[in-house]
Amino acid sequence: MYYTRDQDLIDDFHLKSGHSAGSIKSYRTVFNKYKKFHNMSLCDLLAEAITEQENRTPENRLTIYDRIISFRDYLIKNHIGNTITDSISKIKTFYHYNRVTIPFIPPLNSKYVSKNDLISFADLPTKDELRLAMQFADDELKMWILVIISSGASRCEAKSMTNRTLFEGTNAYHKKDNFHDALKYLARKNNVVCTCKLIRQKTDKPYYTFLNPECVQRIARIKLRQEDFDLDAPLLKYNINHVNHKFKTLNDYLGFGEVGGYARLRPHMLRKFNSTYLTQGSFEGDLLGMDSVDLLHGRGKNKTRQAYYKDNPDFLKFEYIKAMSNISLYRRYDYNIVKGRVKVISKPL
């Protein structure tokens, strides 16, 4: 069947291949790069390959060979090995699905592929460096930093949060019927933990994570200053491309340097900070196991676990509270259990 719209072609490919939501998203990224690189629609690229096949074009003159090789050369200059291999594999799978015979493609020579340096614990931003970054960041970037440090959310998942996420996730504390009054309450308190129900972008699976008290209080104060009371407005204003630019600019200004070819102060490193410090951040107090951190990051359980074990947000919150001092920049936390409820006790460092 011939299609004139890329989306129809792609939908047919995914439907008949039985791809998961995560696979569909990763294919979308590769298809967009392939189309943009060749400045052609996917329909036209496929039609070109089919025409050559029907015309029995000699293998050494096939355009599809040049297209795949030139695209791979582009990826080699801009990406690391696994990304290159996975991207080319997806393009070849797409052609194969549409019954296009692909000529022999020489294997990738690993000597010419960039390799990221392995990131060690010492490469992570320290708490002192993060406090310094907070001094120089504007209000919007401060919120981004604290949200990712405390929740471990990816940029996309953090960006998906709205003011309603904060309002509803702290309702058990403020018990207000409007966001303005809730913010006034939250701005005064230093012991409120926000429960966030998010969707993991890679898998479309819901999961729970949390914002620690210093993050909640700082956001509340900024929102009050900005008079930002629309519940459906984004919690974090910068778009993803701009926030990357802001992090890079601040990283370079503070001289934090790079590791693995990337700035040390960047969202993904803050996620690593969250994971590492929750599991290994202290010789004192409580730490979380890797399985618990995986739950807080939305990383999936296997299918059997997923079928039988459901996440209890109150239990996850209790586990998080016990360990959240490890990812806090300004305060340390203890807790009491009063009448079956966990009460957080906040103390300055």
Stretches found by the model and what they are:
Residues 8-118:
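N-terminal core-binding DNA-recognition domain of tyrosine recombinases/integrases
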Residues 113-131, 192, 202-214, 228-231:
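DNA breakage-rejoining catalytic core of tyrosine-based enzymes
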Residues 127-156:
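Basic, Lys/Arg- and aromatic-enriched nucleic-acid-binding interface segment
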Residues 160-170, 281-302, 307-314:
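A short, basic/aromatic helix-end/turn motif that makes direct DNA contacts
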Residues 161-218:
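Conserved tyrosine-mediated DNA breakage-rejoining catalytic core shared by Y-recombinases
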Residues 195, 200-221, 229-251, 266:
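C-terminal catalytic core of Y-nucleophile DNA break-rejoin enzymes
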Residues 227-233, 245-302:
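Short, basic (Lys/Arg/His-rich) helix/loop patches that form interaction surfaces
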Residues 315-349:
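C-terminal secondary-structure termini that scaffold catalytic or DNA-interacting sites
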